[in-house]
Structure formats: C-alpha cells, structure tokens
Amino acid sequence: MIRWKYELHSLIWLFLVLHLSKCQSDSLTTSAEQHELFAIKKDSLSPWSQILVSLPRRHPLYQSFAAKIQDVTENISDEVRDSNKTFVSSDDAPYSIRIHALRAGHRYSIAIHGQKDGSTSLIKEESVVMDPRAPDFRSMDSDIQVAEHNITMRTIKNDSYLQDSFSIEYRQINPDKKFPVLQILDIPEQKNLEFYLGNLNSGFDYSVRVIAHKDGMSSRPWISTLTTKPSPLKEVNINQNAGSCVEVSWQNDEFSGADFYTIQYSLQSTPNNSTNMTIPSTESSISICDSMLQGEAYQIIATVQKGGQVSEPLITKFQLRPLPPIDFRVRADLKRGKYKLLAELPTSSKIDKCQITVAGDEAERSVNYANIEQTKSGHKICWFNFALSPGERFDFSISSMANESASQKLQKSIVLTPAFDFNAFGLTLQESNGGIELIWPKSEVFMTRVKDIWNKVVGAESLLNMRITPIGNNDETDKTLKFETSPKNIDPVFAKNLVKGACYRVQLFTVTKTGIISETRHNETIRMSSPAVNVSLESVTRSSATLRIVFSTHHDSTSISNCQMHIVVRDMNGKSVFDKRMQLTATFAPLLNLDGLSPFHKYTVNTQIICGSGSSETPQCPAATRTMRQLSFSTRQDKPAAVQDLKVEPLNSYSVMLTWLPPALPNGILTHYAVNVTKIGSDETRTIDVGVSSNRSDHTVQVVIDELFGGHTYSFSVRAVTEAGFGENSPVVPTVSMPLMAPPVPTVAPMIMKESVGSHNMIVRFPTTMFDNRNGEIKQFAIIVSETTADESINRWIESDNGTYTWQQVQRFDVWPSYVAKLQDIQKVKQDVDVSIFEELGEDETCLEVRADRICNGPLRSASKYRVRIRLFTSPTLFTDSPPSQVMTTGSATPAIPLLTVVAVLIVIAFVGIVGTIFLFFWNRTKKARLAAAAFKNGPSKEKESQWEALKMMMAERAADCLAKLGLDATTPPPSSTTSSNSPTSTSTTMTDCGSNPHLGAPNAGGHRRTRSLRERTGVEHRLERLSSGPVHRTPLYTVVTGANTNKSRPVRIEDFADHVRLMSADSDFRFSEEYDMMRNVGVGQSVAASELPINRPKNRFTNIPSYDHSRVKLSNPNNIEGGDYINANYVPGFSSRREFIAAQGPLPTTRDHFWQMTWEQQCPAIIALTKCVEKGRDKCHQYWPDHENVPVLYGDIEVTIVAEKEFDEFVIRDIRLEKSGPDGRVTRFVRHWHYMAWPDFGAPSHPNGIIQFSRMFRHHLPHSPHNAPTIVHCSAGVGRSGTFISIDRLLQSSSFGDPIDVFGTVCEMRYERCQMVQNEQQYIFIHYCILQVLQGSSPSPTSTSTGAHHNAGFVQDGQMIVESGF
C-alpha cells in the first residue's frame, strides 16, 4: 500500500514537472522574470567573477541544493588554477545560489546536487567560461604618462586573470580624429603591461578604450579620457604705455590646444611673492595697471593649460620705467652761494636717483646725478646745486632712474632771478626819528659773508631797491618813495618826514643789471608810532577819583587826527568799572571823574593809544597800539559792614564762646571788634574790644566772654571797627541763658572761734567772699557739723558721702555723723567786700521737742571733737561744700564708764555672736541660690536686698556702738589708708531712708574706701565685710541723657561731663566699677573658628585673646593655603568709619611678615604702637621695623626702610617707606609709625597729658586717605591699651563737634568687634579723665594707689577741693 502511494506520488510529480517545463518554455519570450529550472548564468554586473544558479520555488523531491565548482581550465599551472568550491542554498535566498570569487577567463565545471533526508543526487552539471577583465590603469600599481605627442599607459597584470589578447581603441575628441585599433597578444610570462599611443596632437583630449579577449569573448572595456600636454607659448611681449599700465601679449602654437592661459608675475627680488592671473584661451593679451610698481624689475611666468595638463613655463624678465618727476624749481641757496634745483618725485614709483642736465647760452651742457631723499612728510625729492649766474637763461632737463632705466624727461627753460632774503642779509627795517630807516649789518665779518653771497646769487652789479608807499590816504598813494643800495655802500637808507600814526607799505627786492627782479620780495606794513600821554591821579575819596590826562610832548593836530585813547579802570577782582574811548586832539587834556567806587578798594588804570582804527584803513595795515604805564590807586577807608554768622555757645555757667565771621565788606583795615554784652532785664551793658587775628583756616573769630553769672540771660552784639569808625551791628542778636550750676568751691574754710567754745556750743565765722555767684546767685547756706573720732575721721555710717542727718537723728550714734545745724537764706552782698558772718552752734535747747526730721541747732556733745563746713546753695539741688574747719574740742572731759554699761555691752556682743552664727548657717545652705542670683541683675527682689542690707547695718551699728563705749575704736589706721583732711571727696546721694533733708549730704572725710578695712571704717572686723548683699541695681545718674538704652549706651552732655565724672568717682570709684562690670560679658560667645584652627594657634600671642571671625582682617591667600589668610587683628569702629582702625596684637617673630602684608594690602597710612618691645624683662612685641635709618630690610616681599625718625619725651615718630614689586613695576608707599613708650602694661599712664598730646598730634598729621584706609593700633595683646587709645581718639573727635560723650557705649561697641577691648577698670576710668582733662584743661591727672590700681582722690580746682552736689 505504501509503495503504491509512493509510485502514484512520483507519477503526479512527473506530470507536474513536464507541464511546468512546457509552460516555462511557452512564456520564456514574454516574461524576463521566468527562469529555466536550475539555469546557470553569469552575473550581468560581474560576469568575470560571479555565476547565478536559479532554483525552483518548491521542489517535491529535494529539500535543499548545492553547487560544486571545479576549475577545469586547460594548460595552466596549479598556482593559477582556482580551488574547488561548494555553495549551498540558504533561507535568506532560497530561490538562487550566487557563486562568487571566481577568476576572470577561467573555465569552471558546475555540478548542481539536490538533497533530501540525508541523500544527495546530481541534478545538473555544466561547464562555463568566465568573461575576461580589462586592466585598470587607475589603480595604485598603474601609471599614465602624458607628453605633448604621446601617451604611455603602464600597469601590472593580475596573475589570476586569463586572456588571449588586448585591443586598444583611441580617437581625438575635438576635432574628431580616429586612430587604428591596436591589437596586442597577451604574454602570460610577462607581468608588466605597457601600451604606447603615439602621433598625437599636443593639447587635445583623447577617448581611450582597453578590452581584454579570451576564447572569442571580450571583456567590458576600460574607458578614460586622456589629455596630451599642451605646447608652451612661442613668445611673450611686454609693453609699458605712457600711463601706469603694462600690456602683456603672447603667441600660442597654432597646432596646440588650450583651455586657458596662466600669467604669474612677481618682483625679481622676491619671486616667491607672486600674483596669478587666469586668461581664457580666446584672449592673447592683458593689461596690468594697479599691481605693478613703476621702476621695479619683474619676471612673468606664462603657461598653457588643457584639462589637467600644464605646458612648460615660459619665463620673461623685464624692467619698468620709473615715473618722471612731478615738478622742479630752481632757487638760490644762500648758505652755499649756489642755485639749487629741487625736484619733487612721485611716491608711487621706485626711483633710485635723478639725472639732471643743464645747458646755457654761455655754459657747456652738463649731466649730473642726485640721490633720492625722503622728507618728514613722506615726499620724495632730489636736489642739486649749480654755480650759475643770476639773470641768465638756462635749459634744465630732469628724469627719474631705476636700475639704469630712465623715465621720460621733464624740461624747463628758466631765467635765473637774483636772490633776496631779508633775514639772511641781516637787514633791519625800523621806525626812527619820525621816519623809516633801512640798516645794513654792522659786523664786518658778516658783511664780508653777505658780499660773497651777493656776488654769487644776486649779482655783483645788482642793486637792492626799497619802495615806501602810503596806505589808506588816497591823495598820497602816488607819492611812493624809492631808494637803492647795495653791500658796496652800507650807509643806512632813511625816509624822513613821515606822518605820525600813518600806515606805510615797504617793499624790498633785488634787481640785476639786466632788469631781472628777484622772485622773493620783502613786504612789510609799518604804522608810525602813536603819541604818548601821561595819566595821573588828581584826587581820591571813599567812593570816587579824578584822573588827569596830558600829552608827553607837543603835537600838531594833523599828526594825531586819526588816533584814539582807550582807558579802562578795573577793581582788585579784575572787573571793569570804567571803559571809554576818546579821540585825541592837539589840545587834549581832560579830567576824568570816576564815581561809584567801593571804599578801600585798589583800582588799576590801563591806558592805550590806538592809531589807525578808522573805517578808511585797509586790513593790510593793523592799528598801532601804544600802552602807557599802568596807574594804581586805592580809595579811602569807610565804616565796615556787619559781621556774619554770629553765634554764641555757653561753656559753663559764667563764660560763653562767641564766634563770627568777618564782614563781607570790611571797607578798610579792621582794627578790632567791639562786643557788647547786655544782661536781659537790666541796664547793665559792657563793651569788650577783641582783636581781629584768627588762627583758623575759615577765618572764624572766636572769643571767650567771662564774668557772666549763672541763671541770667544775656544778649550779644558785635561791630567791626576801622579807622573810619564803628560798623553796623550784626543783623542777628543772639541771646543765651547761662546754666545754673553748683557754686564754685570756696577757697577758705570756716573758722571756729576758740574763745567761744563751750561744753555744748561754739561760734563759727566765715567770710562773705565765699559767696561766689559765678555759677548762679547763692540763695542759702547751711552749716554742717561733723563729730570726729580720735584720729579726726568722720563717722561713715551713712551710705552716701554727702548724706546728712538732723540733730535729733544723730543722737543714737556714739560718734555723730554729719548733720545740718542751720539752713539760712542769704541777703545780697557785695562779693568784693570782705564781711564776716558769725553763727553760734548748739544754742537751741528745745531740739528734742521738734520732729526728728526737722533741722535744729541743738547742743553739742561735751568733750567731743567737731569739724564744721559751710554748704552753699544756688538751688535746692545744686550745692557745694567748703573745706572743713580745723578740729575743735568742746569743754569738760568724758565721765568714767560705769560697770553696768560694760555688762550691757558684753550682753550685746554675745547676742551679736548668736545672731551671726545663725546667719552663717543660713548663708551656707543658700549659697547656691545666692551664686545663681548674683549672675543676673534681676535676681533677688529689692525687698530681700533691703532686708539683708538692714540686717548688716544693724549688726555693724550695734558692734560699733559697743566697741566705741569700750574705747576699742581708737586704733590708728595704716598710713596707706588715710588721706589728708583737707582733700575729701564727696558724692551726691538723696537720703530718703533716714528721714534727713533730701537736699543735704555729708562729705567723705576718708580716702579711697576700698583701701580701708571695715574695722577702720566702722570698728567691725573685716569678716563681716565679705557678707554678700547680692547684685545691687543702681539707676543711671541724672547726667546720662534721658531716653538712652543704658544697657548699651550712656551718653553724657559735654556740660554735664565734669559732674558725671565726680559722681562716678564717689565712694572709691564704686559706680565706675559697677559700670565696668556690666560690660564683662559684652561680645562674649561670638565665633572664633579661625583662631582655634591648629595651624593658627601659634600665631596668637595670648590664647585667651582670639580674633572674632566676623570682623577679623583677612590676608590675601592666592594659593588657598589653610590658615594663610589669618592674622590676629580685627576692624574696630572709629569716629568717621566702621573700619577706621585695625586693633592687632604685637607681632610675633613668626607673624612679622604677615603684619607688613596686612599694612600693605589695607593701604594703612599709619601704625600706632603703644608698647615697648620688652617690658619688665618680658617680650611684649617683636621689633618689626629696621634698626637703622636708610637701611632697607626685606620682610616677605615688602622692602621696609626708615627714612626719618624724631624723638619726643614719651614717644617716637618714624617715617617708613614701603616698596613692593608689582605687574606695573615697583610701587612705593609711605607709612608713619607712632610709638608711645610711656604706657605701663595692664594699667594707665600716670598723667593724661602725654597721651592727649600724642593723640592730638596723630590726628592732626594723619594724611587724608582717598580709600578710607584704616590705621593699625597695637600694644601687646591688642585689647587693653589699644582699646583705650581708640576710645580716647574717637571721643575727642566726638566732643569737638559738640556731641554727647558716651564712654560706656564706645567700649561696648568695640567689644562686639574684638574681645576685652579696654582690659581693666583702671583703663576705663583713665578714658574719663583724659576727656575731662581736654574739656577743663586745668584738671590734674588721676593718681595711683600703692597697689597700682587706679585711685581717684578727687578733682582739684584752683588748688581746692570740689564737692559735688546731689540730685
């Protein structure tokens, strides 16, 4: 069954195949896409290397097909024979098999096999000869050589290709010409193939076809168009026309073809720098006009091009003629005594030299050559000198030459004119004695030279002619004066009797004997001089003057009829006040009145006589002007105008500062000023004479008016005075109310009358001269009584030094503190009359019956010592205490202490001990709470503070009373803790807690409170003194400006500053200490990251003085080195700028170069040094400047030189030059070094005068900086002395402008920029004393205690104590 099915399937397939074959044969002619099954055909594109086998789409017997290839070529070697190959069908191309990589000309046997289920059967086998392949003459191994009449083609045959022969077909394209076909047999053993095509025409295109043949088959042809090389040009002709163009023509070979011609021309000297031109083959010439320079030597290279072939070049060299000279002229050369031919040459041509030919009637023809010169303006010239005779005719011919090629000639026939030069001949033409005179030179040597030149270029027989013709006067124009002269006769030529002021034209020229006139003439117009006049001052007043004008000599009217006088009068500012022209006549003698002049002004009179200014004058003859001698005069003085900008400013309660500017119109020399001072509300007026000198740059006059009285109002007027009298009153009459202040300190102390001293009373006497009303009228006086101890000190129980009690309030004390015994109004008394006042103390026996807070003059204690002082009042709050009287003891001795009193005292002492023990136990338990409360001002409440103060006061009072009764308070204090009794210091405090008069205070009879122990002050052991009372918050003093934020700023008006310092100094500078402690934490906690870098720590002199990051000075650091921009310095604000100063530490040896780098980069004009290099054996600052003057030292890249040095008592000033190399060269700057050496470390100078002088001198000499460059200030750490100096400088500037003085705010502001500025309390107090010293002038410096701390012993005025008043 299976076999039957297989045979049936084969029959069906055979039927289909036969049917398909019949269909394909039927449609073969109608469809190109139908292929015979398994057809073997050579590829149409590559018939020499590829065969294509067609396969059926679906074959019932085979699944795939393969084509086996075998090279069956006969008579070839095995090396040439191709290897066997097999190609199979693929899914990518299932309908054909492409056989490739076959060899041209080889015969191959191709067998097609079918495959199915592993069995293979041969389907078809056929033999095919591959087409031959023509050689490729464009390949790398090929070469085509083209000549004018032949072409040679060479290549290397491919060993694998087979051919029998080659045929070469070639023909000329245009015009068409056919050549015989070349047949060449192939020689297999010959690898190189060469074809030669001869008998060709030059310059034509040829079509070449090369075909390979094999077994009757021909290859596809190799086709190319080849061009023969054209023939070179036969000749090139070059013609230079009359212009600047060059005509280039050529002749080509008539049998040679050409597409275009190439012309390449260049200078023969620079053949590589050429210009190329392409010309169509239809042209045979070209013009070159712009690119060739006349006179240069050129070469032209001409070639013919056909296709890509170029003929042999034809080189032609030629020389262009230079351009002829533009023009020439012949002039006489007086210096050489010859005629000079000067030719101007064109710049657009090369010219080497000039050829000059000269011929005359009597002179032989001569040829000369001259070199070329170039003028400053860029023109080319040539010149030549000839020894020719003037007055004769000569023919000149000149041409340019370049490389022996001559240009066209420029010819002229010239008659040589005689020479003439007015200046060269040394002639002088001048007005003389009413005429015009021509003068020859006086020097014989010069005249010898003139005669020699005259004979050569003028002519020995030639003459000099002078013509003088009047101008502008019609009736005289024909009256020309003629004169002749020559060097043979050197007498002057004089034309006399000319009209004064008239204008004449003078002509000078030379003439030969043949009548030839010189080409050069001297023309000059001369106007005869004007008549002279004298101008004199006839009279002068304050506002007018009279001038008289007369002629110097007599003139007739005709000689001056055309002249005018121009007179101009100007004031001292150059402004014209009189300007007038007047016609001159023979009788001209006017008087000129000048009115409206200003008093005491200088005037100048300028007079000119102008002749020839009429309308009939010609512009050729300008007017003649004669200037007369200038006359000056001054008007008389007058009363001055009012002064300007009158201002008044009170200085204190009894003096003012009056300022004004001088009058705008002084109207004379000011002798003085009269100042009228009037007290408002009275007829009292006084006049003060003030000098006119002023040492200020703005000429402001300043005067201090004294002897005024506080509390009164005054008006001021100022008048300037000249010798003419008093000027006007000032338009503004300023008034000022004098401030009311505490009375001046009396110079005398009250005196207790010894004979009046009793057991309970005494009489005190004091003069009325202590009632000084300068600071205001004294309204009251009070008598202050103080009991003293055995050492004559005053009981200090009351907290305030100025606080006082009443008589009844002091009864509870064993030693009475100060109390007011009497308060009495003062009647007006004359201060210059010495009248004594007597007052009895202790006269009132009824004081126990009145209220305790009432003032009462109760009995004194017997056998007790007392001091008395007088308190003077200008108002209830303004008072001053006199010095205390001598100590006086009342009568009768103190009785013995009874036994019961001693027992009572012992009981009190035991009670005090028990209370103290209980308190100490409580103190230890609350220690932490107290420490926390002490860190803040707003800690414990005021109520607890008052309770604790009351407890301490009560315990100290009881102990003092007991010890006093036992006689244990008589211990003498150490010498260092006491001060003289006549120099106490007091403060103003209102005692509201003791019930005393709030307007009365008690003076402090002791010295500095901090230097005395509690036992010395109260008789109690010092251990009680150490008991803390917590932070005490004090309200700012009344002297601080109201409304200020007292946590950051405490400004004080200038007029209140003295009182402010006194109040701050009271109680041993307690308020100074309290205020300084408030700034302890200002600025603390700000970032100091740069200072704490490990690489920067060695750059800090002190580890606790870092540099704040936000304000530190940064050095330039171009290489970005870590820490390279760090220096321990900060910007600190001053008066004028936020960065007016740089506060820096004293340089270390390792930071010295950084210090100078900072100085250079910040462009600092000055350096302030406030420390010595070594103090007390310790290094405080490295010496960063050179040791010797004018010896440069290099610090880093900055050269430092001291150019000058000046020493003072306390400081040294050095001028230092800094030099540094930069991109623009070496840059030089100057820095002034201020070195103050009298300032101790951690302290203050002993006296402010030195540092004030130093600060003022620095500020006066500080140069102006256009960049607002900062000044460097340093000490050792750069905080203490540096901060103090900056504060002083800033506050002195502020006070000079009248601004409030804010020491507290200034220091706070600095501490925000650099830590610990103003390092201790002593320096803080010193700032106040410096400012006060400047404001008051006479105040002495603060002194120092034995411990070295700042000590305030009080201010001294007029040699006496100042006692400050309370609120």
Swiss-Prot record:
Keywords: Glycoprotein, Hydrolase, Membrane, Protein phosphatase, Repeat, Signal, Transmembrane, Transmembrane helix
Fibronectin type-III domain segment(s): 229-325, 531-630, 642-740
Localisation: Membrane
Transmembrane segments: 902-922
Span of the signal peptide: 1-25
Disrupted-gene phenotype: RNAi-mediated knockdown in a lip-1 zh15 mutant background causes the descendants of P5.p and/or P7.p vulva precursor cells to adopt a mixed primary and secondary cell fate. Multivulva formation in 19 percent of animals. RNAi-mediated knockdown in a let-23 sy-1 mutant background partially restores vulva induction.
Protein origin, superkingdom: Eukaryota
Tissue-wise expression: Initially expressed in vulva precursor cells P5.p, P6.p and P7.p. Expression is later restricted to P5.px and P7.px and their descendants P5.pxx and P7.pxx with higher levels in the cells proximal to P6.p descendants.
Topological domains, Extracellular: 26-901
GO cellular component, one term: membrane
Intervals, Cytoplasmic compartment: 923-1367
Glycosylated sites: 75, 84, 150, 158, 273, 276, 403, 523, 534, 676, 695, 802
Pfam families: fn3, Fn3_Dep-1_1st, Fn3_Dep-1_2nd, Fn3_Dep-1_3rd, Fn3_Dep-1_4th, Fn3_Dep-1_5th, Fn3_Dep-1_6th, PTP_tm
PROSITE patterns: FN3, TYR_PHOSPHATASE_1, TYR_PHOSPHATASE_2, TYR_PHOSPHATASE_PTP
Residues at the active site: 1275
Chain intervals with Low complexity compositional bias: 977-990
Molecular functions per Gene Ontology: phosphatase activity; protein tyrosine phosphatase activity
Record membrane topology: Single-pass type I membrane protein
EC number: 3.1.3.48
Region of interest called Disordered, as start-end residue ranges on this chain: 967-1016
Ranges where the Tyrosine-protein phosphatase domain occurs: 1072-1334
Principal EC category: hydrolase
Subunit structure: Interacts with pat-2.
Job description of the protein: Phosphatase which may dephosphorylate receptor let-23 and thereby regulate cell fate during the development of the vulva and the excretory system. By inhibiting let-23 signaling prevents the establishment of a primary cell fate in the descendants of vulva precursor cells P5.p and P7.p. Similarly, may prevent duct cell fate in ABpr precursor. Also dephosphorylates the beta-integrin subunit pat-3, probably within the alpha pat-2/beta pat-3 integrin receptor complex, which leads to down-stream effects including the negative regulation of let-23 signaling and vulval induction.
Family: Belongs to the protein-tyrosine phosphatase family. Receptor class 3 subfamily.
The protein, known as: Receptor-type tyrosine-protein phosphatase dep-1
Native source organism of the sequence: Caenorhabditis elegans
Gene for this chain: dep-1
